[in-house]
A protein has these predicted regions:
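Class I S-adenosyl-L-methionine-dependent methyltransferase catalytic core
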Residues: 1-175, 179-199
Length: 199
C-alpha cells in the first residue's frame, strides 16, 4: 500500500517558523510583548513558507493525499484542527490522534498548549482489530526534540504514526512529504515496528 506522512508548515505559523518572519514571536514588541529572539535562522528556512499560511495550500495537499495514497497522516498545530476537518470529505474515514508534549514552554496564551493533533486515514483493511498484532493508542506522550529544525518530530512519534497506519515494511511504501530534518525518513528506513515504542 502507498502510505504518506505529511508534516507541513503549520497553518498560521509557517512564515514565522520557516519564512521571513522567523524572528517575529507573538511575544515580541511587534505584538505588544517584550520577548527578544536572536540567533541565526534554523537550517529549515524557506523563502516561500508564507504560502502555507493560506488554507488553500493545505486543501491542495489534502486532496493529493486522498487521491494518491491508501493511508496517510497529517501533523498540525492544536489551533489547526478546526480549519482542517472541513477540508476532508465526510466519506473519507479518519481518526484524530493526539501527541501530548509534556515539557512545552509557556506561549502567549493563558492556557498552556501541550498537544498536537494528527489526522490519520487508516488504510482500508487495517481499521478492524481482526488479525492485528499490535493495538496502537490514538494518543501518546512523547517529549519534543530540539535539533535545530522547528517542528522536527522525535523518532517515537514516527513509530506511533506508522503503527496507527498499520505499516508493513514488506508490502508498504511510505512517502515523507516534508523531509525537513530527515527524522521521519530515518525512522521509516528502519523498517521494523518497535512494539513497545508508543504506549
Amino acid at each position: 500500500m502507498r502510505l504518506c506522512i505529511a508534516d507541513p508548515p503549520y497553518l498560521g505559523h509557517a512564515a514565522i517558523w520557516y519564512g521571513s518572519g522567523m524572528h517575529v514571536s507573538k511575544l515580541s514588541p511587534e505584538f505588544g510583548g517584550t520577548a527578544r529572539i536572536s540567533g541565526v535562522k534554523p537550517a529549515d528556512h524557506h523563502p516561500d513558507a508564507a504560502r502555507w499560511d493560506i488554507i488553500d495550500t493545505h486543501l491542495a495537499m489534502v486532496e493529493r493525499l486522498i487521491s494518491d495514497y491508501d493511508g496517510w497522516a497529517i501533523a498540525m498545530a492544536h489551533d489547526n484542527l478546526r480549519a482542517y476537518l472541513p477540508l476532508i470529505p465526510a466519506s473519507v474515514p479518519i481518526r484524530v490522534g493526539i501527541w501530548n508534549k509534556p515539557q512545552n514552554l509557556p506561549g502567549g496564551a493563558r492556557v498552556l498548549n501541550t498537544y498536537e493533533p494528527v489526522i490519520v486515514r487508516i488504510p482500508e483493511g487495517r481499521r478492524a482489530s481482526t488479525g492485528c498484532a499490535i493495538f496502537p493508542r490514538d494518543s501518546v506522550t512523547i517529549s519534543r526534540i530540539n535539533n535545530g529544525f522547528p517542528g522536527a518530530k522525535p523518532p517515537t512519534w514516527t513509530r506511533w504514526v506508522l503503527d496507527m497506519l498499520g505499516y508493513d515494511p514488506e508490502i508498504d511504501t511510505v512517502d515523507d512529504l516534508f523531509a525537513g530534518s530527515g527524522a521521519v525518513a530515518a525512522e521509516i528506513a528502519q523498517g521494523v515496528l518497535d512494539l513497545g515504542s508508543a504506549s
